[in-house]
């Protein structure tokens, strides 16, 4: 059986390391990591390290700005990245493309370029594409023509500008002119050298001091920003809409799993359709009265079971859509049909100005006299037309949506059934709907409750905000009134910062001394003095 050799303390060799004191930021490992990989973005010039305006590249795919690389080649004649010999005739002009959002993208697939995109260019034309595009449309298809200009090229003409799996060309720590610290190129990148201060006396010194001061301020701001760690109690809680779903829109997952979609990291709640959200809250039935020229028919609507159909019927009735509309079809021992403003049986529309789907439930059937159901032209073609059965019609089950029944006025229904009709089942005497009155409307009640709830929440949020401001104001009040922030003296901090507040004028001290002596002379008496006792 082996022995446990791991010690419960740090040994001397572990502390000392290979070259001295060992810690996460010192020792040979720390020194090697301090000068680690520094990546240059694909849209930056490899010489100025700034975004390029006139991009060109070398045959091995190193990108420069034309205005920067030409003077360098004329002076040194080498590649600033590799240190190898380079001539201006070897430079290849590149044609990058941007979308409406000013982002570089592939002009064929519209894929936005990022640091993780493999980017390639065609040497003969200079057009820049995503390498995936060239691989699918050129290499695998053996179509050796530029996808934009249709100019021929060979496989050797494909230049890799960025390969996420091979970033040696983008490693700034290995750039030749940076490793060798060429003074002219380092000086060119200073902003002060972009200003012509020649012949302006000591202006250059002023600019240098100003630049040093600005850099120190930027460093201090960066440190302060880093120290400000946002916490959950500093953020105002997001108010969700009343119809927010318990699931998200899925945009974040879509952007992470698809290379075509731009990155999206927010978790946004999906919103349920307002009507669909309302239908789930309806638990009551509706009641209405159909007023005809032959009498009144009271109906009960199954709003709790067929909310969409009942909502359509109720809203049409409340807007007067059914006023003065006739029953255009009347078949004895079967049904009476109406709800078409044109009176032809071919018109009528829903409140959404389009057909809406059926709400078929096996528990509600055409199994009795006085069943209220929707007329349609086929599956999911409901509009405004409806019919009332004179007898059971089981052959209509599963084809039409039953959404109510007659609960009063069956004698009026018998009168309507007895009216003679022509050969097209059209009543010979006009049967007209004068009006449809609503007695109980759960949809209107829901809207009223929802409005009151939203108003109450808005008022509560406003009151909470006012209370928070009032509490902050009260906390700022001290024992002797509002707390006044202390004004810092010109002496600043450090040693002796309180000395200035204790300085006094010598004349003031001397005056106080004279007044004190006068008071002592006035109050001095011989009584109680035992000096000569």
UniProtKB/Swiss-Prot annotation:
This is Peptidyl-prolyl cis-trans isomerase-like 2. Belongs to the cyclophilin-type PPIase family. PPIL2 subfamily. Residues 284-438 form the PPIase cyclophilin-type domain. It comes from the Eukaryota. Residues 443-519 form a coiled coil. The lineage of its organism: Eukaryota, Fungi, Fungi incertae sedis, Mucoromycota, Mucoromycotina. SMART domains: Ubox. Residues 454-477 have a biased composition (Basic and acidic residues). Its main location: nucleus. Its EC number is 2.3.2.27, 5.2.1.8. Pathway: Protein modification; protein ubiquitination. PANTHER family: PEPTIDYL-PROLYL CIS-TRANS ISOMERASE-RELATED (PTHR45625), RING-TYPE E3 UBIQUITIN-PROTEIN LIGASE PPIL2 (PTHR45625:SF1). One of its GO terms (biological process) is protein folding. The keyword Coiled coil applies. Residues 38-111 form the U-box domain. One of its GO terms (cellular component) is catalytic step 2 spliceosome. It comes from Rhizopus delemar (strain RA 99-880 / ATCC MYA-4621 / FGSC 9543 / NRRL 43880) (Mucormycosis agent). Residues 523-533 have a biased composition (Polar residues). GO terms for molecular function: peptidyl-prolyl cis-trans isomerase activity; ubiquitin protein ligase activity. Keywords: Coiled coil, Isomerase, Nucleus, Rotamase, Transferase, Ubl conjugation pathway.
